[in-house]
Swiss-Prot record:
This is Non-structural protein 5. It comes from the Viruses. Transmembrane segments: none annotated. GO terms for molecular function: ATP hydrolysis activity; magnesium ion binding; nucleotide binding; RNA binding.
Length: 176
């Protein structure tokens, strides 16, 4: 059998030196930061950690040295210029539009309910009329069939045998 490769993982980290990194560029003790570095860590990791702190300190210096743009445009006051609306007017308009939307929704619901009631009343009338028509049709059918049956039975004595056979076959055909 071939040997299975083994991987050995270390349980303990070896702590090495403490590095001092200058964050703000001042040579004071307050601006110095101590970083623990592993002796067995990758070289790129230790380089990248110190490099990132140096970049951070340079970026911080550049930001503090830059003068900010006009602060009048970026800051807002309670009373705006005459051409622009104040925040109070904007909030009132927003509240009014919300209230208008709510009232519009309520009005639409009321209109829908009224239309449904009208549709329901017309549909009820249509249903009642269709029931009346069906009842009248069934009554007339019963009357015509009953009367026809009675006349056939009363006059069956006067019919000949072939006429009786054809009458029976016609009745059976209508029953199907």
């Amino acid at each position: 059998m071939s040997e299975v490769p083994r991987f050995e993982l270390r349980n303990k980290r070896k702590v090495g030196k403490k590095q001092k990194v200058d964050i703000f560029g001042d040579k004071d003790d307050e601006s110095m930061l101590q970083i623990d570095c592993e002796t067995d860590s990758l070289i790129s990791e230790s380089v990248s950690s110190t490099h990132s702190y140096e970049d951070y300190s340079k970026a911080y210096k550049e930001l503090t040295l830059e003068t900010p743009a006009d602060t009048n445009d970026s800051t807002s006051t309670i009373i705006d210029s005459a051409y622009e609306e104040s925040w109070y007017d904007k909030t009132i308009k927003d509240e009014q539009t919300k209230e208008n939307k709510k009232t519009d929704k309520k009005l639409k619901r009321i209109e829908n309910i009224k239309e449904n009631n009208q549709n329901d009343s017309t549909s009820m009338q249509i249903a009642q009329l269709s029931l009346r028509i069906q009842r009248i049709e069934s009554e007339t059918k019963l009357k015509t069939l009953d009367s026809a049956y009675n006349t056939i039975i009363t006059q069956a004595d006067n019919l000949t045998t072939p006429q009786k056979k054809s009458l029976i076959s016609a009745i059976l055909a209508t029953m199907r």
